[in-house]
Structure formats: structure tokens, C-alpha cells
């Protein structure tokens, strides 16, 4: 059995989405509709929304809450109308550990329509290890629980 054919247009659409996210700035949030279908679904460990305005809200909040957030795509697999991306999300907290670059490693599953727009964006990352352990009070508790579970 052969894998589904991946049209060159899908490869090009994925490349455009990657370039968009790797160069995302606060001003670019308003242009998300150029890459996402109107009723696109977005889900990650802390959000689940439908529609371009709601997706824009997630990324606008990211820029409000964090210093210099940016994505670096480290790998991609495109098959048919889907792709799977691995990435590093780099940022600094505004309220504590100021100026210290944090990294969250994760992956995204994207499904594109015939026009090359994202209809499903599902992010996978370990909220406990990648985020909560880096927070002052919660982080100490998470690290203690992890240590107890591993002993």
C-alpha cells in the first residue's frame, strides 16, 4: 500500500505556514486568516477553540504574556493533506526569570484543505514538564512529585 499522494501545492502551503510561524510578530496575528480556514479548530494542552478570531486571540495573548516568543521548526513530515511538525518554542517570562530564555519542545499535527488552509491545528507538548515545572511555586511541587514518582 502506498502512502497518500502529497501534491506540490500542499508542500508549498506547509512551507508558507512554517515561515509564518517562524517569523510571527504581534502585527502578524491579524493575518492568521490567510493561513487558516474560517472555522479552523485549534487545540493544545491549555486551549481548545474554533474559528480564526479565537485562534488570533490565543496568539495575541501569547505576545501579551511572554517576552520575545518565537517558534523554530525542527522537523516536518507531509503526507496527503496532513503534516506533522516538531518545534522548539522559545520565550522569556515577563514576571519572573526575566531575560532567561525558556524552551518548550513540542509537535503540531496540521490538516489542510484543498486551498492549502489549515482546518485543524493540534499541538502536543508536555505541560507539566515543559511549562509548569518552570513556574516558581507550582514548579517546585511538580519537581518534587516527579522525584517521588521516580524513586
Walk through the language-model features, giving the residues of each.
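Exposed alpha-helical structural elements
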Residues: 12, 16, 31, 54, ...
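A general secondary-structure boundary signal
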Residues: 14-15, 30-36, 86-88, 108-111
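A beta-strand edge to alpha-helix "cap/lid" segment located at domain peripheries
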Residues: 2, 64-70, 74-151
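A solvent-exposed, acidic/Ser-Thr-rich amphipathic alpha-helical stretch
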Residues: 29-33, 37-83
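Short, low-complexity N-terminal intrinsically disordered segments enriched in polar/charged residues
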Residues: 1-30, 34, 148-151
Amino acid at each position: 500500500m502506498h502512502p497518500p499522494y502529497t501534491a506540490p501545492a500542499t508542500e508549498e502551503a506547509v512551507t508558507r505556514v512554517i515561515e509564518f510561524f517562524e517569523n510571527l510578530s504581534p502585527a502578524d496575528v491579524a493575518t492568521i486568516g490567510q493561513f487558516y480556514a474560517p472555522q479552523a479548530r485549534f487545540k493544545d494542552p491549555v486551549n481548545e477553540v474554533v474559528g480564526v478570531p479565537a485562534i488570533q486571540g490565543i496568539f495575541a495573548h501569547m505576545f501579551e504574556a511572554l517576552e520575545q516568543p518565537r517558534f523554530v521548526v525542527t522537523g516536518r513530515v507531509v503526507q496527503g493533506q496532513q503534516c506533522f511538525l516538531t518545534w522548539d518554542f522559545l520565550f522569556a517570562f515577563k514576571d519572573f526569570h526575566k531575560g532567561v530564555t525558556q524552551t518548550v519542545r513540542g509537535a503540531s499535527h496540521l490538516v489542510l484543505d484543498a486551498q492549502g488552509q489549515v482546518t485543524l491545528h493540534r499541538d502536543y507538548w508536555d505541560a507539566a514538564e515543559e511549562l509548569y515545572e518552570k513556574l516558581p511555586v507550582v514548579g517546585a511541587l511538580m519537581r518534587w512529585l516527579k522525584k517521588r514518582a521516580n524513586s
